[in-house]
Amino acid sequence: GYAIAVLLGILIGLLIHHFPYLQKNLKPVILGIQTLPSVCWVPFSILWFGLSTQAILFVVIMGSAFSIAISVDNAIKNVQPIYSKAALTMGASQRQLYQHVIFPACLPEFITGLKQGWSFAWRALMSGEVMTTSIGLGQTLITGRDLADINQVTLVMIVIVLVGIAIDKGVFSVLEARILKKRGLTA
């Protein structure tokens, strides 16, 4: 689900950035949708997909894609205009401009947006699992609640936090460190 949300978020973010009409009319809608808690998508997903994996997938995508789209648009906007002007002055095409100037310049902020999108996707997955009948940490949490087993509830919450820390340290921190090292920004 997260991979689909990333692709969708990048596409929407690029479209919003590239077309002023979308920037003016679609971005406010996306900002509004982004503020919805993921659990709000659960009733729609159950009505459309039933109590299925597709329902959870839908909640994960809706919970994170719009956050990623906004971060892509903002990351590109925050690239210093002088970089683009210099590249265009030297004869860069639009493709070369994005490939060699804009994307590398916005990469650190983009990674931060991916990290935020992942945290939204992770929360959405938990809310989807809590509301549907799938097997996973969310359902294990609900089972603990139903059995009034505080130890199970606490353990599941600790596992959820540990998975979040592991993803941050094992994926995003490694990616950020590589980018910073490649740019000579680390000791």
Regions found by a protein language model. Give the residues of each.
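Cytoplasmic-entry segments and transmembrane alpha-helices of multi-pass inner-membrane transporters
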Residues: 11-47, 70-74, 85
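Transmembrane alpha-helix signature in integral membrane proteins
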Residues: 1-15
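Hydrophobic/aromatic residues within the transmembrane alpha-helices of Major Facilitator Superfamily
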Residues: 2, 36, 49, 61-65, ...
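Short cytosolic juxtamembrane segments of multi-pass membrane proteins
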Residues: 176-187
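Hydrophobic alpha-helical transmembrane segments of polytopic membrane proteins
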Residues: 137-175
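Short helix-capping/hinge motifs at transmembrane helix termini and TM-loop junctions
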Residues: 16-21, 49-51, 63, 131-133, ...
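Short cytoplasmic-facing helical segments at TM-TM junctions of multi-pass membrane proteins
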Residues: 71-114, 137, 141
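Transmembrane alpha-helices
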Residues: 58, 62, 94-128, 151-155, ...
